[in-house]
């Protein structure tokens, strides 16, 4: 299938709940001819702590994406995104875009 011109902005790596390292995902997107790719790791949620970014991991992710944007410049346009759970505080600083999501509903203070 020809994926030239196709972009994906809802991609999770092993930094949250995906299986592959960010660079492996980027390399595959380049192989497929994708001109743009947005990684969108999960924002921190206490009920999803093993698969979401805490404050330090969030900073590390933004820094990593900055380095990868430079490394892959001219081969693919990269975007640093975050998938933000509706029930958690929003901090979009450092991100190119935010995906709003609802994974859990709060009922009487519990998920």
Stretches found by the model and what they are:
Residues 107-111:
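Acidic/polar active-site rim loop that often engages polyanionic ligands
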Residues 1-84:
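An N-terminally biased module of ancient metal coordination in phosphate/nucleic-acid-related enzymes
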Residues 38-40, 96-106:
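Non-cysteine beta-strand/loop elements that form the S-adenosyl-L-methionine
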Residues 86-93:
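Catalytic cores of alpha/beta
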Residues 74, 93-95:
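Short glycine/proline-enriched coil/turn segments at helix->beta-strand junctions
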């Amino acid at each position: 299938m020809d994926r030239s011109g196709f972009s994906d902005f809802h991609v999770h790596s092993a930094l949250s709940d995906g299986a592959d390292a960010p660079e492996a995902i980027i390399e595959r997107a380049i192989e497929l001819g994708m001109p743009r790719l947005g990684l969108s790791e999960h924002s921190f949620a206490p009920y999803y702590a093993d698969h979401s970014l805490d404050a330090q991991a969030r900073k590390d992710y933004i820094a990593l994406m900055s380095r990868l944007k430079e490394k892959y410049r001219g081969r693919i346009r990269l975007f640093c995104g975050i998938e933000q759970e509706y029930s958690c505080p929003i901090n979009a600083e450092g991100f190119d875009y935010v995906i709003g999501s609802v994974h859990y509903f709060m009922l009487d203070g519990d998920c």
